Amino acid sequence: MSKYQIDIEINSASQQLPSEEHIRQWISTALDSQQLDEAEVSVYIVDTDEGRDLNREYRERDYATNVLSFPADIPPEVEIPLLGDLVVCAPVVEHEADEQHKPLDAHWAHMLIHGSLHLLGYDHIDNDEAETMEALETQLLARLGYADPYDEASYPEAIPTNPAPRRQASSSAGHIE
């Protein structure tokens, strides 16, 4: 039995979702990096409209983004292993993987590790924080057999993961308008 409780709810029509086993493996890899005794994380996989609604409501940004992290707000004196919730917008992850010529499973792994690290207190607001977080993401992904997601040379010959025509995206990375 795992020391982590990872609940997964899918509200997406995507036919390209990773298995629940992979989702749990990727999140557990991030949690293991912090040597936690136990943890609870909820993962909610959504489509573009819901992703946009949540991003607008909680971040005041009117577009769907790849992953939203909602750390649990539990007082320190309450001993509950709840870390928080992750919301992943499947169409955005698929679009980004295609646009960046990355294998879809590698990008899913990256987004779930990235979101999990946010739940663990990591951030990328300033350059030092970003370097620390990106280095840990790269290390964890390498442990899983994936290339450095920040090194474009890691995917020079990659075949686009989505054979469908590309969607129109704004110039900002990480979202679909």
From Swiss-Prot:
Tell me any Pfam family this protein matches: YbeY
Return the protein name.
Answer: Endoribonuclease YbeY
The record's NCBIfam families line, in alphabetical order, gives:
rRNA maturation RNase YbeY (TIGR00043)
Q: Compositional bias (Polar residues) spans? A: 168-177
The free-text note explaining how the cofactor binds reads: Binds 1 zinc ion.
- Superkingdom of this protein's organism: Bacteria
Q: Where does Zn(2+) bind?
A: 114, 118, 124
What coarse category fits the chief subcellular location reported for this protein? cytoplasm
Q: What is the lineage of its organism?
A: Bacteria, Pseudomonadati, Pseudomonadota, Gammaproteobacteria, Cellvibrionales
